[in-house]
């Protein structure tokens, strides 16, 4: 089992890294450089660049029309469904369709993240190997978790978070027979990713610290705000899904293009909403954003992500959740720091804490996101604020809904899964 876990770690690590390369490739194609390949330069560029998400949506819509499994089996919630009800069976062809459509969506500027497709890709590798060797249902489930862990670990250079993601979200099982192979897969996946991409952290941040213990009160309040904003995000997300499904009376093949057009129009004034938003998160973490801009971007990112995914674009919600949290934390931190500069940390510190708090609430996985945040930034100096804010945010969210965004998706389909099992 451990040998298979190691093999899955290598294959899933390679596949998830290749998926990152696909996103980067499409990012070049749908850019000024890509347009220059077609001989388009000069004054036409400012008018065409906002249309890139729409062009990406057109191609995505065509692929999804001819390969509907790309939509039906895409996302973390579909992996959870496969683990709980389908003995871990995930169709092998979703590796290609999921990779292509998600990379197109994100690379062309659609507001989405890569964690959902990465989990899908890694899990499909684990499922394929488990079924190839005709293993038992329970062992295939574990191997699916191994693939998910390795994919996350390789893609984000985050081995601990990969392990916790698989155990806390995908399997809902912390027993030793699942823990050991998942650790092996995550380690090998991380090593593979580092061999291909280098040992780089995702975000480069200055040193942060807790200025005074009285500041914990402010972090408690930030946690409350993050929980409320997380709930707003999920509400708008599902409303957007319903709107495009029920109210938009155009052929389904064209809906991703419409969503891309809307996001492209928003990006004319606010290019930060495009893609995963990592560049602008870096700005928030280095104190380069005005609080008013950060505050506005909270809501624009919620709308852009909801429109992208609701219209039929493919991608994950982790990166948008990090973005929303970074903007909320930055705006909140700037305000409290202006009021009391000697007793509070810099806005960058609050931006960092807000990232984990919003993502932890949306996913209802605070422990995973606490560790993920440390590994994305390599910053362990503010563990107390991060822990308390993530927990308060998650429990504030639970005051409105006890289920993560993934479980809520399944509930809308009439499927109730808790701890990796159908209820």
Regions found by a protein language model. Name each.
Residues 1-423:
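Alpha-helical transmembrane segments and immediately membrane-proximal extracytoplasmic
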